């Protein structure tokens, strides 16, 4: 029994081996045939492509002939093109066009602005006479061609007593000076002193001399 079984398995092995050899041979033959066909087909395709390329090059060398259809197509293209619209960015002058020196110069005020600020400019010119506790160098100050007026904003770190109220805030320098009590007292005192000096030796002096003479009699 054992020998018969072994013989059967051996026969099966031989048959399977022979089948594998046949199949491999068939596959090799089929692959060779396919390669031959592919090579043949590739050669044909290369020839066709080369012919087409020659035809294209010859056509490109020929001169162009403009027809009515080309003119119509060009007109349609021109109609479809939208007109260029200038945007706001293009209308605005470029910042690069300005000179670098213009960045550091103040604006030149108009005549109306000069009239409005004329009194303030006079006060700045004679600022040495406004406050006795502040002294300035003697100089011939003139109104510059370019100037600007700004407001001082108090810092939040400052105490409330050092800040100005809404009533104290004025639109001009003259109004702020006239609204200050201390400055008004100083101005009145100086005005009286100047008036006494200017009136000395005139009618007041004559009246005083008359009164003195009457008392002597």
Curated annotation (Swiss-Prot):
Zinc-finger found in the keyword field: no
Key words, A-Z: Acetylation, Nucleus, Ribosome biogenesis, rRNA processing
Single GO biological process annotation from the record: endonucleolytic cleavage in ITS1 to separate SSU-rRNA from 5.8S rRNA and LSU-rRNA from tricistronic rRNA transcript (SSU-rRNA, 5.8S rRNA, LSU-rRNA)
Domain of life: Eukaryota
Basic and acidic residues bias spans: 87-101
SUBUNIT field: Interacts with FAF1.
Protein name per Swiss-Prot or TrEMBL: rRNA-processing protein FCF2
Organism, as annotated: Saccharomyces cerevisiae (strain ATCC 204508 / S288c)
Lineage: Eukaryota, Fungi, Dikarya, Ascomycota, Saccharomycotina
